[in-house]
Amino acid sequence: MKNKLDYRFVEGYWLDQQQIASIENDTQNTLVIAGAGTGKTTTIIGKIKWILNKWKLEEENIPPPKILAVSFTHASRVELEERILAEILQDDLVFKIYHPEDFIEVETFHSLALKIIKDRLLGRRLEESGFESFLKLSKPDLPEEKIEDFAHLYSLIRNYHVDSVEVKELIQKRFRHFWQKEDLSQNLAKLEELEILVGQYEEHLEKNHSIDFAGLLEEAMEQINPIFAYDYVIIDEYQDISPLEYLLIRNLRQLRPFKLFCVGDDWQTIYQFAGSEISLILNFEKCWGETSKFKIERTYRFPEKLVKLSGKFIMKDRTQLRKQIRGAPVYVKDQIVEINGPSERTDLNSLYFFFLNMPEHASVFLIGRYNFDIKKISRCEFLTFEKSEEKVLISMHERPDLRISFLSAHKSKGLQADYVLIINCRNTVLGFPSRMKENDVYNMVREIAIQRLGQRKINKKSCGKFSEERRLFYVAITRARKRIFFLTVREKESPFILELREEEELNTYYLD
């Protein structure tokens, strides 16, 4: 009789040896570094099946081990839960006795925090709109650029679990060594203005009996109840974790020394602007203690040529963890193409012929560095546009069968299409990579948090230029299942494109 909890067989596929080795390891801390498209979620499902299979074979007379699986967004949490239940509920002998809710919880960090403090909410509601929306409504005269800047800084301070007083002290110290007097007064004035606005925001929350997401996590850290003691904690997309989320999980471990199983890809750490901290995955062992480390390097998403090109590109940043990703040996003519014209308009007009000759029912992503890059494509008269929640849906009258979407590089993460076209690959301030100057105060917030967590500071020289932009470009490249196109303008090519031209996998087509 077939074992329905066979962890080597997940969702109709046999797992590879690297996946199985990581699953069978049962040490206190496990870090699985998995490349794009290598089957991170199937590995997590396999791990849960392994835990239940082990329990069933050894200790079926006691309740199953309590498992917490954490994902980062509501959509990914729902998908993960559905996929886990679809696999484990096949074993009807186990679930005649136990209900999955008795031993497995699938949460986001916020839903977990909400569960922890549920009894202490005392009628408070969750303020989902947050600080930025508060500023837009209460400060209509404040320029939008300033609102975004304050909202970003506030988000970093909260997610990095740093106090603005500490930032002020570091600003004073930095002034003595590096800054001009005007830099000092400008940065101190910004923090003082932020403190006033935050005070007003906190009054607004109190008046409306509300709590925001960061407050939820902070309160949960202090109110952990023994009913939240777990035997296993599994974290998906670990590279996206913030210091505040890390501290919540660390506090949970004080209740019971659970076994930790984390799956992530440092090459795809692209949410630093929202509080993700790459040193938490690069210095994992320093955070959690002795760790068993595994790699999953066989991708099921894209062909070998694209794997080779993208891997060489990302590993030019020497701080990234080394991986040798292997792809499918699929031959498609011109898998990696640069379209180089004398102007952006020429490049975009050429899309008409590319779209016209694409296979039937192909899926296509147009990826920009910024959301506003859609304005460039909107000049194409042969395309029509329809806004949806996460992306812009595009249609072409002559090819209604094509499924075309525009997304920013950040929003493309986790998604894939047959054909990907990266637009705006130009060497400009708002090109790709972005040359927007890094904010000194943002960097100081990170610095304080890293020191407090006992982390080793990342050496910027070893990262090379544009380290986060490089990871973002890598994410955009690896959305393609079949072919990737880069749209460039002659004599204004992105430095990333100049790098890629050195590789034999890239074919450049020059337009007149």
Regions found by a protein language model. Give the residues of each.
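ATP-hydrolysis module of ASCE/P-loop NTPase motor domains
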Residues: P100-E101, R120-I196
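P-loop NTPase Walker
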Residues: M1-L122, T478-R479
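Conserved RecA-like helicase ATPase core segment
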Residues: E11, K49-W50, Y246-I336
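Conserved helicase C-terminal RecA-like lobe
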Residues: E360-S363, S412-R490, L498
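Helicase P-loop NTPase motor core
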Residues: L31, T38-I44, E290-S292, R298-E398, ...
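Conserved two-lobed SF2 helicase motor
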Residues: E105-S111, D212-A220, D401-K411
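Structural recognition of the conserved hydrophobic beta-strand(s) that form the central parallel beta-sheet
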Residues: A69, V106, K259-D265, F406
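Conserved helicase NTPase motor core
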Residues: N3-G39, N187-L280, R298, G414
